């Protein structure tokens, strides 16, 4: 199962962690994993390479973590909308492919120094 945890700060999604496998097909032929991977990369690249919003991004074996560095900044306003769109996209995939994606939202406090 793919596990997607979104981070909420001050009524907005400010980050996410995605890990796991959908198990909806053989390795390399799992359309759900492909859809989620593509959406994760599009979201991360849009935030960092096109919106230039500061974000901590960690990509590891079977896991991606992205957290906005300053969620209150003007540059992060659009990035929060992109994360919200990604959340909605995963909800749609999860509804179509039941039992393949678990989505949770965790409340977080402001980062230290804020």
Residue ranges of predicted features:
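Short, conserved glycine- and acidic-residue-centered signature motifs
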Residues: 32-36
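N-terminal intrinsically disordered, cationic/polar leader segments
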Residues: 1-29, 41, 45-114
């Amino acid at each position: 199962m793919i596990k997607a945890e979104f981070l909420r700060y001050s009524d907005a999604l400010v980050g996410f962690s995605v890990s796991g496998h959908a198990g909806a097909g053989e390795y390399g032929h799992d359309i759900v994993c492909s859809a989620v991977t593509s959406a994760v990369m599009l979201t991360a690249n849009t935030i960092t390479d096109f919106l230039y919003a500061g974000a901590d991004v960690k990509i590891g074996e079977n896991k991606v973590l992205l957290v906005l560095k300053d969620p209150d900044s003007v540059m992060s306003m659009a990035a929060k909308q992109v994360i919200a769109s990604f959340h909605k996209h995963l909800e749609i995939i999860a509804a179509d492919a039941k039992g393949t994606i678990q989505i949770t939202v965790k409340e977080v406090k402001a980062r230290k120094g804020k």
